[in-house]
């Protein structure tokens, strides 16, 4: 595991848990909540000195980049602590876009997953009350090595007992190794 250099970009990617179902069952509620959601995301990303990607993949998902990993982790925590109903964010934080996307995709709504590389650079500078919980090792992509997988914890956040959203092949590899 290598430490993230101070000048390396840290990615924060988020998606909404069950987005398609929510849009199908309550499109008016989702549309009404979307302006507040977007304003809140924009506020917390800017507060941390981050930049939102101009090309958003989904209207209720986003990508942001930060110069400092601590700012990305703080932004993720603030977003998870803020009521954003009906949006429940699945957040990934890492130093490469593909790895961040993978973390985002295996997280549950209300959960933030952080790579070991990023965690090692923020461990001494977490937001007040925040801790990191080791969840095992995870391959971050076909070309990236395995990383320690950490969950951002805080007394104001839910505790997760469910397994992560992983394809069976990935889950089997983690259980065997």
Spell out what each predicted region is.
Residues 39-42, 63-157:
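Catalytic beta-strand-to-alpha-helix segment of the class III nucleotidyl cyclase homology domain
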Residues 1-71:
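Catalytic NTP-binding/metal-coordinating core of nucleotidyl cyclase/transferase enzymes
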Residues 1-5, 152-177:
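Intrinsically disordered or compositionally simple regulatory linkers and C-terminal tails
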Residues 1, 43, 47-48, 78-84, ...:
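Key residue(s) within conserved catalytic/signature motifs
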